[in-house]
From Swiss-Prot:
One of its GO terms (biological process) is D-amino acid catabolic process. Belongs to the DTD family. This is D-aminoacyl-tRNA deacylase. The lineage of its organism: Bacteria, Bacillati, Bacillota, Bacilli, Bacillales. Its EC number is 3.1.1.96. Confers the ability to grow in the presence of 20 mg/ml D-Tyr and 500 mg/ml D-Asp to B.subtilis, showing it can be used as a selective marker in bacteria that do not have a functional copy of this gene. Can also function in an E.coli MG1655 dtd deletion, although in this case it confers resistance to toxic amino acid D-Tyr but not D-Trp (D-Asp is not toxic in this experiment). Homodimer. A motif (Gly-cisPro motif, important for rejection of L-amino acids) lies at residues 137-138. The keyword Protein transport does not apply. Gene3D superfamilies: D-tyrosyl-tRNA(Tyr) deacylase. It comes from Bacillus amyloliquefaciens. The gene is dtd.
Amino acid sequence: MKLVVQRVTDASVTVDGAVAGRIGPGIMALVGVTHEDTEEDAAYLADKIVNLRIFDDESGKMNLSLLDTGGEILSVSQFTLYGETKKGRRPNFMNAAKPDQALLLYEKWNELLREKGVKVETGIFGAMMDVQLTNSGPVTLIMDSKQ
């Protein structure tokens, strides 16, 4: 699994003009699933993201986690994270999991986050979505369960 993680002051996702998910301070996570991913990958990244110390303490140092701050997560599925651009001019998405496999792991990922006590908002899997966010910092990280 791959994630693009952004620390945000707010974020929302809209589908067909209607807000599907909206959060205040927390993390906006774009979530990609590949063929070899398992529930262990989802569990590893769920634990990592809620404990990742990317929020400022009273001294302005990144010492606090999402759990420490009571922040929220906006989780948006994005198969394009597995796009290959080495050859040609059009991305190749062969490394992205098939939709049925990706949906199961994406839903498991969100469930694991909720089990950790985090409020999770989502987009709509497979839909064309508009994502709005205010990146705080900016802080943006790429996480991969295989690396």
